[in-house]
């Protein structure tokens, strides 16, 4: 079981994959004041459903004009998980998995266009058959859920099919 997590600055998503099939998906787009609490709640819900899962998440990075502290919500969201299961959590630099999937690595400019191109890669993988929840998330262009799925998929394909 893999959980992919895309925290985002103002919104985010998480998706649980079992053998490539989406079994749960969460997305959140809270107000600025509630952003971190919503992320923590969403992450806690996902982890409580799948305590044996391996977590793959985008590593916080500093963007021009923004402090790394801006990404404090990510660490609050998954800090307890990381402390409890440090060997079952993997931080991935956004540019690494995006470039390996052929996506544009710029965070904002062509992000949605790149995600739209890569969403078909998730669905066309002959080794998986994502359920309707996943397909709906992609068709509605919920980029946070799609990114969460992509980072989990990247890990599964490049690191040994999501071994526990």
Model-derived features with residue positions:
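Phosphate- and other anionic-substrate recognition elements at nucleic-acid/protein interfaces
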Residues: 1-164
């Amino acid at each position: 079981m893999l959980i992919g997590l895309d925290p985002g600055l103002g919104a985010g998503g998480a998706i649980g994959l079992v053998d490539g099939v989406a079994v749960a998906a969460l997305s959140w787009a809270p107000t600025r004041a509630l952003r971190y609490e919503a992320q923590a709640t969403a992450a806690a819900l996902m982890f409580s459903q799948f305590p044996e899962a391996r977590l793959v998440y985008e590593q916080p990075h500093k963007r021009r004009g923004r402090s790394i502290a801006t990404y404090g919500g990510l660490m609050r969201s998954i800090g307890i998980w990381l402390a409890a299961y440090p060997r079952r959590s993997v931080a991935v630099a956004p540019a690494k998995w995006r470039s390996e999937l052929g996506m544009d690595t710029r965070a904002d400019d062509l992000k949605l266009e790149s995600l739209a191109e890569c969403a078909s890669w998730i669905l066309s993988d002959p080794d998986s058959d994502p359920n309707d929840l996943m397909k709906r998330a992609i068709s509605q262009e919920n980029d946070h859920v799609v990114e969460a799925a992509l980072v989990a998929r990247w890990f599964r394909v490049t690191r040994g099919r999501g071994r526990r």
